[in-house]
Each structure stands twice: as structure tokens, then as C-alpha cells.
């Protein structure tokens, strides 16, 4: 076979190839079908048929052919059945779930697949991959994300879009995008909460009469990268659903992708819970301190409350201003309550210790000291009177039997006694109540009564011999000695204020006793003694009367109740002793009893001891209930 035969074979092959390329168009030229024997390799058959030929000329020819009569404004099968559009998503990352903004950010590959018969080709069996520039030349579904706040298609280094054409006209369109979608977070159990965030896909303009959206591959349309990590959250799973929604423009198919995540509580344990627990426990150190350490205990309580308030404020800055009460808010409030109770406990024992405790004890000890002072006052006064009576008795017993031997009192001595009685203020019956009987039985000596004693003036002088020995010859010395004794004994009675060794009160320093009665000075007593009857029987009866009066007055002094004794210190203790002046009514007695039971000073060490056990126990029970409820 020569050169002519080879040329003829080549022409025949070209004709056959041309007829195959123009198979869709009617041609008057008959088509020939060549059957090769089975011994011909498949590679040779593909070479002749050119089904895997996708070179530049073939692709250009295919695109020119399909796009020459393609209208991008019309959906596939326009006027006929709706176009099925399959959706699939490949998630590469979920960057952030924000509690403040109530949203999350997701980056993904979003794929849509549909069939457009206008793009079918037969020149090759290979799929054609086209770049982003075909986006303006081909029809694509108008899917959008219903809950998206912001979204963008990545354009580094070029716009991340891809088209893939199949010979039967199937189109697969994929884009790489990042969107920020709204997510309504339920923060009631924060930070032990589980959240579900949705990604909703829907057609914007085409109703179910034009487009039907559905998930690809029978529920396996969602794929996640193996390195998916969500900050502060753990990915639990995903679910996909679809439903039909109705609007006034028609019905639409809505696809829903739901992510389940759980918050990691470890960071909050370190940043919030442990500092809060340690601060609360630190506030209980005051229970082991002495209850009179006011500065230390109050400082610990206030510092603990300040730390808890700072932690709460720092936490609120990271959370939205919502009305719901979060679990962590309850925990911090309970810790604040325990710290406040520790402060309240110290206020309670501080009130018991200082108002009903040591401060109360000196006022209570004043009562027996006042009684003792009153007793001493009576003892001094009556003792001095008894001494005077004894001196008078001794003087009478030492008198001579013959009264004519006693010299008469001179007018000068009587004048001295009279001037002394005028200078010494006489005790009245109202001010000297314990000696009323004595003042009634022994009238005061006057100048006239003394002048009626012709024979006893010398005896009266001898009755004062004990008090001023060596001055019997000079009668003018007697008033001076009496005056000195008055001045010496004018300050003999003491009154106890805070201690029994302290100075007299203002009343006693002005000559009054504990009850406000005038004290009987020795000058007055001496004047009275001068006028007493020197008869033996009268002296004895007067002595017995004074002793009887002393016993009665002493008994009445010890029989005084607390209110009468406290009345003597009214000017100094009016504010503190007003509690004891409650009238004896049933309501007052109940109130006093309840107040004593509630504010008993003996509870001071017991309250701290109970608090050391009760506070940790209550706080531990609260933590058990709190964590079991929120974790399980």
C-alpha cells in the first residue's frame, strides 16, 4: 500500500471525527460507524473517539457552544419543575462564641449542587473546573444565611469561588466564606452552661415552586475538620434539620444546622471560684481572734467584701447586661452573704462584750459599794455620837457626891459655848433621818438652859476632857478645839465612784451623806451633848435609842432595791442606768427576759465557738448542692 492509500485512510478518519463532533446537529451527510475488532486496545479507541480530550481547544469550544445561547437571568428548567439544590458544608473553624455580643464566628466551605441541562456537553467525559470569573456568566441559587450579622468571601490570593461542570449539566458551586451569626445564649447556668448555636440557610427570592433546598448525601452533608477547637468551649455534636416556612410571598425551604457546645469551667474555677472561696474562708479567721480585737476583725471582714465585689465587677464587664440571674452570680452573692454574716457575728458579740460585759460590770459593782459607803457613813456618825455619850457618862460617874463642891460655870465659858453652837450649823430632822429619835429626846443646849445649871457647869467641862485634855483651866480653848474637830471630820465619809479608793462625790463633799442627808459634824454633836440631861437613866436610854435607830437604818440601807441605789448616781449614770427603770409591767418583764436571753454576755465565747463549726458546715453544704445541681 503506497502513499495514496495512507492519504485516503487519513481523510476517512477526519471525516469520521467531524461527523462525531457534529452529532447533535442534523446533517445530510450519512454517518458511518466503524467496528474494530476486540484486539484493538482501548487506548487506541479513546484516541479515535477523543472522550478524554480536554485540551484548550476542546474546552473553549464547549464553553463557546453552551454559553452562546445561555441566559443567566433564568433558572434551569424555567417554567417547569422546581430545581433541586443540594447543600453541604465543610467547617474549618469556629473562632469565637461571644457572650457579650450573643454571636459566634464560623469559617466554612459552602457547596451548592444543581443540574442545568443547558450546560451539558458531549465532547469529553471529563469534568470541567472553572474559576470565579464564571460566577457572572452562570445562574446560581440565591441562598443566604438567615441569622448572619456579617459575612465575606475570602479573596486571598484570588476570590475563593469554584465551579465544576459535569457532562450531564450538573453544576457544583463552592465558596469559602466567614460569617458572624447570631446565637441566643442561655446564661442561667453560666459558666456550667451548654449552648446550641444555629446556622440557617434559606433561598432569598425563589419559593418552593422554583427551588427546593435539601441537605446533601442523606444527612452526611456536614463535615468538620479534625483539628476543630472552640475557645472556652468543647464541641459536643451537630444536628441538621429542614422545614418549610410561610411568608406572604410564598413558601420557602429552610435548612438548619445546629452546633452543641459546652463551656469549659476550668478557667472560671481558677479565675473566679477559687479566689471567691479563699476570700470567704479568710473572713472566718476572725472567729479565732480575740473578741476585743475590733480593728483586726473589722478589717478582715471589710477587705473580704471588697475583694468579692471587685471579682464580681470584673466578671460583669465580660457579660452582657441581661436580666437573668446567672449561677456564678448566686455563688458570689452567697459568699458575700457569708462574709457579711461574719461581720454581723462580730457586731453581735461586740455589743455583748462592751455593752453587757466589762462596761456593765463597774456599774453593777457600784451598787454594793454605795451600800458599803452608806453603812460607813452611818457607822461614823453613830460611832461619834456614842463616843460623846460615853464621855458624858464617864463625866457624870466621876462627879463628886456633893454638888456644892463643883464650881459654877463662868459667864465667859457659857458665852464660848453659845458662840460655838451658833457657828456650827444644826442638823435638822429632815436631813438627819437616822437620828430623829435622838434629836427629839435631847434638845439643844441654849444659853438659858446652861445658866440654870448651878452645880454642873464644871461637870460639863469634865465631860469634854477626853476631847481636849489639858485645857480645863482655859475655857476659851474649847470652841477652837471643837471647830478643829469639825474641820477634821468634815471629810471623813467617802463615796465610791468607779473604785472604792476614789474621792467623795459632790454631795458628800458638801456635808451630805450618800442619800443626800446632811452629815452630823462633831461640832454639832458637841453642842447637843452640852444640852443633854446628865441623869444616868436618860443617858442609857438615849444610847439604846441611838443603837436601835442605827440597826433600823442599817437594815433599811441593805434592803434598798437597785433602783433606789442607782438613783444616787443618776447624774453620772442616767444614760446607762435608764434600762433598769422600766416599770414592772408584764410587757416590760417579757421584753427584759427576751433581751437578757438574746444579749446574754455569757454567749460571747460561745458564739465564736459555734461560728467556727457552723459557717464551714453551711458553706460546704451549699457547695455540694450547687455543684451537683449545675453539673448533673
Swiss-Prot record:
Region (Disordered) residue spans: 410-458, 491-523
Keywords: Cell membrane, Chloride, Chloride channel, Disulfide bond, Glycoprotein, Ion channel, Ion transport, Membrane, Postsynaptic cell membrane, Signal, Synapse, Transmembrane, Transmembrane helix, Transport
Catalytic activity, as annotated: chloride(in) = chloride(out)
Disulfide cysteine pairs (residue numbers): 183-197
Ion transport found in the keyword field: yes
A family per Pfam: Neur_chan_LBD
Major localisation: membrane
Tissue spec. comment: Expressed in brain.
Glycosylation sites: 127
Regulation: Potentiated by etomidate, propofol, pregnanolone and pentobarbital.
Residues in the Extracellular compartment per record: 22-268, 316-326
Biased composition (Basic and acidic residues): 491-511
Signal peptide (from-to): 1-21
Biased composition (Low complexity): 426-439
GO cellular component, one term: plasma membrane
Topological region Cytoplasmic: 290-297, 348-611
Compartments reported by the entry: Postsynaptic cell membrane; Cell membrane
GO MF, any single term: neurotransmitter transmembrane transporter activity
SUPFAM superfamilies: Neurotransmitter-gated ion-channel transmembrane pore (SSF90112), Nicotinic receptor ligand binding domain-like (SSF63712)
Transmembrane segments: 269-289, 298-315, 327-347, 612-632
GO annotation terms (biological process): chloride transmembrane transport; signal transduction
UniProt domain comment: GABAARs subunits share a common topological structure: a peptide sequence made up of a long extracellular N-terminal, four transmembrane domains, intracellular or cytoplasmic domain located between the third and the fourth transmembrane domains.
Quaternary structure and interacting proteins, as annotated: Heteropentamer, formed by a combination of alpha (GABRA1-6), beta (GABRB1-3), gamma (GABRG1-3), delta (GABRD), epsilon (GABRE), rho (GABRR1-3), pi (GABRP) and theta (GABRQ) chains, each subunit exhibiting distinct physiological and pharmacological properties.
Family the UniProt entry places it in: Belongs to the ligand-gated ion channel (TC 1.A.9) family. Gamma-aminobutyric acid receptor (TC 1.A.9.5) subfamily. GABRQ sub-subfamily.
Record protein name field: Gamma-aminobutyric acid receptor subunit theta
Record gene name: GABRQ
Amino acid at each position: 500500500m503506497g502513499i495514496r492509500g495512507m492519504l485516503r485512510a487519513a481523510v476517512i478518519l477526519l471525516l469520521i471525527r467531524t461527523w462525531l463532533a457534529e452529532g447533535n446537529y442534523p446533517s445530510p451527510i450519512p454517518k458511518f460507524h466503524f467496528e474494530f475488532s476486540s484486539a484493538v486496545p482501548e487506548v487506541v479507541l479513546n484516541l479515535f473517539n477523543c472522550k478524554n480530550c480536554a485540551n484548550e481547544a476542546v474546552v473553549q469550544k464547549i464553553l463557546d457552544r453552551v454559553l452562546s445561547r445561555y441566559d443567566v437571568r433564568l433558572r434551569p428548567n424555567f417554567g417547569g419543575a422546581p430545581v433541586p439544590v443540594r447543600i453541604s458544608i465543610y467547617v474549618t473553624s469556629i473562632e469565637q462564641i461571644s457572650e457579650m455580643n450573643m454571636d459566634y464566628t464560623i469559617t466554612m466551605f459552602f457547596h451548592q449542587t444543581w443540574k442545568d441541562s443547558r450546560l451539558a456537553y458531549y465532547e469529553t467525559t471529563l469534568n470541567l473546573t472553572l474559576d470565579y470569573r464564571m460566577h457572572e456568566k452562570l445562574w446560581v441559587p440565591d441562598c443566604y444565611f438567615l441569622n448572619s450579622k456579617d459575612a465575606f468571601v475570602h479573596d486571598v490570593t484570588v476570590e475563593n469561588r469554584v465551579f465544576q461542570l459535569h457532562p450531564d449539566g450538573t453544576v457544583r458551586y463552592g465558596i469559602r466564606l466567614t460569617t458572624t451569626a447570631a446565637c441566643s445564649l442561655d446564661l442561667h447556668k453560666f459558666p456550667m452552661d451548654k449552648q446550641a448555636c444555629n446556622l440557617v440557610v434559606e433561598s432569598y427570592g425563589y419559593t418552593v415552586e422554583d427551588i427546593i433546598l435539601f441537605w446533601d448525601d442523606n444527612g452526611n452533608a456536614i463535615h468538620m475538620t479534625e483539628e476543630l477547637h472552640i475557645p472556652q468551649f468543647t464541641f459536643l455534636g451537630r444536628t441538621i434539620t429542614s422545614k418549610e416556612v410561610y411568608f406572604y410571598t410564598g413558601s420557602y425551604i429552610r435548612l438548619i444546622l445546629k452546633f452543641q457546645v459546652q463551656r469549659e469551667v476550668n478557667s472560671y474555677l481558677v479565675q473566679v471560684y477559687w479566689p471567691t472561696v479563699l476570700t470567704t474562708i479568710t473572713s472566718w479567721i476572725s472567729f479565732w481572734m480575740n473578741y476585743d480585737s475590733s480593728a483586726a476583725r473589722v478589717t478582715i471582714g471589710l477587705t473580704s467584701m471588697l475583694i468579692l465585689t471587685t471579682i464580681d465587677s470584673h466578671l460583669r464587664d465580660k457579660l452582657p447586661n441581661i436580666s437573668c440571674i446567672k449561677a456564678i452570680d448566686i455563688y458570689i452573692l452567697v459568699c458575700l452573704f457569708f462574709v457579711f454574716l461574719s461581720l454581723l457575728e462580730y457586731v453581735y458579740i461586740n455589743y455583748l462584750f462592751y455593752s453587757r460585759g466589762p462596761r456593765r460590770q463597774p456599774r453593777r459593782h457600784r451598787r454594793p459599794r454605795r451600800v458599803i459607803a452608806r453603812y460607813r457613813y452611818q457607822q461614823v456618825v453613830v460611832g461619834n455620837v456614842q463616843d460623846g455619850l460615853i464621855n458624858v457618862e464617864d463625866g457624870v460617874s466621876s462627879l463628886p457626891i456633893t454638888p456644892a463642891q463643883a464650881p459654877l460655870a463662868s459667864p465667859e465659858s457659857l458665852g464660848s459655848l453659845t458662840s460655838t453652837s451658833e457657828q456650827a450649823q444644826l442638823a435638822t430632822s429632815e436631813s438627819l433621818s437616822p437620828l430623829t429619835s435622838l434629836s427629839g429626846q435631847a434638845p439643844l443646849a441654849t444659853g438659858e438652859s446652861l445658866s440654870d445649871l448651878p452645880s454642873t457647869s464644871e461637870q460639863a467641862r469634865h465631860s469634854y476632857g477626853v476631847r481636849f485634855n489639858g485645857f480645863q483651866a482655859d475655857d476659851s480653848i474649847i470652841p477652837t478645839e471643837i471647830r478643829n474637830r469639825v474641820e477634821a471630820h468634815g471629810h471623813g465619809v467617802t463615796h465610791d465612784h468607779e473604785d472604792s479608793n476614789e474621792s467623795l462625790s459632790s454631795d458628800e463633799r458638801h456635808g451630805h451623806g450618800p442619800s443626800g442627808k446632811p452629815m452630823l459634824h462633831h461640832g454639832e454633836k458637841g453642842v447637843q451633848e452640852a444640852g443633854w440631861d446628865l441623869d444616868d437613866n436618860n443617858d442609857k436610854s438615849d444610847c439604846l435609842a441611838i443603837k436601835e435607830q442605827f440597826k433600823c437604818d442599817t437594815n433599811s440601807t441593805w434592803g434598798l432595791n437597785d433602783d433606789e441605789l442607782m438613783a444616787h448616781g443618776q447624774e453620772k449614770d442616767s444614760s446607762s442606768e435608764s434600762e433598769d427603770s422600766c416599770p414592772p409591767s408584764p410587757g416590760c418583764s417579757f421584753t427584759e427576759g427576751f433581751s437578757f436571753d438574746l444579749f446574754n454576755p455569757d454567749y460571747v465565747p460561745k458564739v465564736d465557738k459555734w461560728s467556727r463549726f457552723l459557717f464551714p458546715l453551711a458553706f460546704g453544704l451549699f457547695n455540694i448542692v450547687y455543684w451537683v445541681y449545675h453539673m448533673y
